[in-house]
UniProtKB/Swiss-Prot annotation:
This is Aspartokinase 2. Lysine-sensitive. Regulated by degradation in response to starvation of cells for various nutrients. Ammonium starvation induced the fastest aspartokinase II decline, followed by amino acid starvation and glucose limitation. Its EC number is 2.7.2.4. NCBIfam families: asp_kin_monofn, asp_kinases, PRK06635.1-2, PRK06635.1-4, PRK06635.1-5. InterPro entries: AceGlu_kinase-like_sf (IPR036393), ACT-like_dom_sf (IPR045865), ACT_Aspartokinase (IPR054352), ACT_dom (IPR002912), AKii-LysC-BS (IPR041740), Asp/Glu/Uridylate_kinase (IPR001048), Asp_kin_monofn (IPR005260), Asp_kinase (IPR001341). Substrate binds at residues 25-30, 47-49, 74, 125-126, 150-153, 289-291, 295, 354-355, 368-369, 375-376. Pathway: Amino-acid biosynthesis; L-lysine biosynthesis via DAP pathway; (S)-tetrahydrodipicolinate from L-aspartate: step 1/4; Amino-acid biosynthesis; L-methionine biosynthesis via de novo pathway; L-homoserine from L-aspartate: step 1/3; Amino-acid biosynthesis; L-threonine biosynthesis; L-threonine from L-aspartate: step 1/5. Keywords: Amino-acid biosynthesis, ATP-binding, Diaminopimelate biosynthesis, Kinase, Lysine biosynthesis, Nucleotide-binding, Repeat, Transferase. One of its GO terms (cellular component) is cytosol. It comes from Bacillus subtilis (strain 168). It catalyses: L-aspartate + ATP = 4-phospho-L-aspartate + ADP. Catalyzes the phosphorylation of the beta-carboxyl group of aspartic acid with ATP to yield 4-phospho-L-aspartate, which is involved in the branched biosynthetic pathway leading to the biosynthesis of amino acids threonine, isoleucine and methionine. The gene is lysC.
Length: 408
């Protein structure tokens, strides 16, 4: 048969009972004749607890020592899961990220995987063992332990699936799949049977928290089929692969949204591309991520608006004021309590007028659009936070996302 990589996040292994459930999931695939690799996160909120311990010792602990500390969380899970499998009569073996051959950049706290030596894992799989690997971690060429940052366990699972040429990578979570939008806000949200890599990447980048963008990008680059599944239910989840044929007649596949957005507007800039380049280069050096950008021109002066996360707004203004003389602008204004609402679907490429329909729906609901950004398969709008849920519900209804494609 084939090779399956399974990944269980922190909530899916947050107790002994849940670890037993993960063991049963691995056994079910083993009984089908598959080779099985299981990637796990630290149990529950144990990573947060480790961070709290570090903060109790030091306000600014070194990144190296933080990686040394945080990497221990997954080691607890792999050991317990391996024990659970052995207790059920299955031969299992656990490995840390570095024992599994995962090599990374020398960037503590947010390293990227550079290479995987699969020889140890392949040998154990050939012996018929279920292999358990700690997610979120690896080692540099200089034998320094690193962690992969947010979504690191997802990335570990997909990277191992690619390196081992697995048939599929199953991501087990506390939700049964990828929905047309967040069902906590829109009760009629529907679980998707399938979605393309590109669509999932857009949704992930726009705030859909089911998968980390880096993991989706890895899966797309190496053509690893992903399935997002419930860790507590047995029904099929959402399959993520190259341009899914499952729901082709959907123009819009899903709606993503996030609040706590701030618009920053700079007035009276001296015209010139060099000035704009300086602004965004300066912000990037301070790790401030700029999203939607709008430029206006009035005679010999330029105005520019862009959006940032509200948590970065004060720092953004401080940095710009620091360089005010060099940038030669008149003033800065900010508007907070905004939200970004985006529609995503590969069907937009061949169906003009989707953006116009989106704007018309929002206008009918008296929702003021403050900023707009588009790509081939996405349209994003910035609206008031107070209008966010109404906008999502209205667009979900207008594009009939609650209906199965066969009924649309």
């Amino acid at each position: 048969m084939g090779l399956i990589v399974q990944k269980f996040g922190g909530t899916s292994v947050g107790s002994v009972e849940k670890i037993q459930n993960a063991a049963n999931r691995a056994i079910a695939e083993k009984q089908k004749g598959h080779q099985v690799v299981v990637v796990v996160s630290a149990m529950g909120k144990s990573t947060d607890e480790l961070v709290s311990l570090a903060k109790a010792i030091s306000d600014q602990p070194s990144k190296r020592e933080m990686d040394m500390l945080l990497a221990t969380g997954e080691q607890v899970t792999i050991s317990l899961l391996s024990m659970a499998l052995q207790e059920k009569g299955y031969d299992a073996v656990s490995y840390t990220g570095w024992q599994a051959g995962i090599r990374t950049e020398a960037i503590h706290g947010n390293a990227r995987i550079t290479d995987i030596d699969t020889s140890v894992l392949a040998d154990q799989l050939e012996k018929g063992k279920i292999v358990i690997v700690a997610g979120f971690q690896g080692m540099t060429e200089d034998c320094e332990i690193t962690t992969l940052g947010r979504g690191g366990s997802d990335t570990t699972a997909v990277a191992l699936a690619a390196a081992l040429k697995a048939d599929k990578c199953d991501i087990y979570t506390d939700v049964p799949g990828v929905f047309t939008t967040d069902p906590r806000y829109v009760k009629s949200a529907r679980k998707l049977e399938g979605i393309s890599y590109d669509e999932m990447l857009e949704l992930a980048n726009l705030g859909a928290g089911v998968l980390h963008p880096r993991a989706v990008e890895f899966a797309k680059n190496y053509q690893v089929p992903l399935e997002v599944r419930s860790s507590t239910e047995t029904e099929a989840g959402t399959l993520i692969e190259e341009e899914s044929s499952m729901e082709q007649n959907l123009i819009v596949r899903g709606i993503a949204f996030e609040d706590q957005i701030t618009r920053v507007t700079i007035y009276g800039l001296t015209s010139g591309l060099t000035t704009l380049s300086t602004i965004f280069t300066t912000l990037a050096k301070r790790n401030i991520n700029v999203d939607i950008i709008i430029q206006t021109q009035a005679e010999d002066k330029t105005g520019i608006s862009f959006s940032v996360k509200t948590e970065d707004a004060d720092q953004t203004v401080a940095v710009l004021e620091e360089y005010k003389d060099a940038l030669e602008f008149e003033k800065i204004e900010t508007e907070s309590k905004l939200a970004k609402v985006s529609i995503v679907g590969s069907g937009m490429v061949s169906n003009p007028g989707v953006a116009a329909e989106m704007f018309a729906v929002l206008a009918q609901k008296n929702i003021l659009i403050k900023m707009v950004s588009t790509s081939e398969i996405k349209v994003s709008t910035v609206v008031s936070e107070n209008d966010m849920v109404k906008a999502v519900e209205s667009l979900h209804d207008a594009f009939e996302l609650s209906k199965h494609p066969s009924a649309v």
